[in-house]
């Protein structure tokens, strides 16, 4: 997606709010889902985000699905003001197939490396997505280890709802020793294979937002 994003304090490493919390969630979600691309399909997500501390981050995240139920994901997140710069690689394995009015699951495994001597960390998440009559519900439980070796768990919940040509969502993320995040977002396909999206949220009394795109081919 959208993360995820842990292995750091939300306010001190703002880039990670979009990197490790839910692993790399599909835009514009922060909470990861249990969905994957169709076999042989790739996409590239590019988005600009403002963290709760005001830092601006540019993120580029390509994804490719070489096999059914498998996504291979890379991500580069660069703080434009010269702060943290990270690269993330992760694998998402879908454990059960999506079904109408039912639920499916996925596991995610990944690692993030920070430049400028800030170390690296690993993470994994268990994701559940349910197709319900009015929309879709997503849960993501993440276990992440900080560069200092501390376990930093988080739990995210998101609700998506289709409104004509737009899809909106509301989501919340709770992480140990951090203020909870509450956010909303919108996405829309403007051309075949091209999506534009945006998010707005609050965390610890501060505002965070993002603008992005997703190109699928």
Where in this protein do the model-derived segments appear?
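Transmembrane beta-barrel domains of Gram-negative outer membranes and organellar outer membranes
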Residues: 24-217
